[in-house]
Amino acid sequence: MEYEIPRECLGEALAALPRIIAQLPFKVQFPVEVRFTGPDDVWLSHGYGRDSAYIAVHQFSGSPYEPYFRAFEAVCAPLSGRPHWGKLHYRDAESLRQAYPKFDDFRAVRDQLDPGRIFTNAYLDRVLGA
């Protein structure tokens, strides 16, 4: 799981991780990864319109992860966090609409270019709306 948050929120998000990890009934097996980017102008980009910090948390395949990932997401989402589109997250279209200023504009373009929803699947229905 990886989340992008506004760079100025990094300290708050990182400070929550030791508490989350201490409460887990299993060991965390990977280091936490942090990286930074500048803003961009791509509507559904994680870094749209702001300086960004990315925090990634991982577990080995087959190892328990859900309590860790859900607790981490619960920290990042209220910080205007945006989940990595290609990694596991639990958000849906309604919650993502709040995180992306151009979300509805993107959906309008999608409605115009793919009104029959030929280019969709269950994941896209969940994160963009049906």
Residue ranges and their predicted role:
Residues 1-98:
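Substrate-recognition/cap regions that form aromatic- and gly/pro-loop-enriched pockets
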Residues 81-130:
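Activity-critical C-terminal alpha-helical subdomain
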